[in-house]
């Protein structure tokens, strides 16, 4: 039976429906009811967002709660994005109109700003499109991460790291290979990308070349990824790409209300990143990671704190 793609009129998720008669379909993401009208053909064209702001400072901030998805639901990710947005605008000089925010907050009514797989893919393309020397780009993701079997043979642990969009059960995850191809490889000379990834299994989710890790014992270690396994060229086009992540590829992340005084849930990693940047402007990357680890290890009665690790992942052709 022929099928077509439509978008949920409440949350923007992609739905696969028969191309035949008018019917009502329940969205698996938000459980909203959608009246589906007949199509003149087997497929309808997907919506394309029209982000038309291109400046020297741009950011994509994505926070996903997975509302209604049983045990998958998170509490602090939308707060993480709101905090990161405030930090970039107030303290880093990013124009509000140059920050694209995607959340599944029930107050968000724009279907193109719902964090579906398609919308995240389009947002990443917008982030890098037309970038040039001197540009500062930020990609922040707060949500679920996972690992999938590596089908291309370029992973030492035989697993691809992925981020999970809100419709991942229907549309699948976004692989590290795709993230690298979209926002890392096209990065031009003189441009800089910072990715802050607050999710499980996020250590090498941008597939960058160098991993600089702070061990639990406080030692710094360097690891050059490419010589250990045969990999295609995943370098930038001359720019600098930096990913700061809260987990190794085999670790899980954590939410907690402790860091906000019990007022609201936040991602421990995102909170510690913003707190450190606000209190120690101009610090080195090494000091940033050390300070973040100290903050999280200071969370009272939290078993996650003793396991916390940070990775600084780096790629450059400059």
Segment roles from a protein language model:
Residues 2-318:
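Cysteine endopeptidase catalytic domains of the caspase/legumain-like
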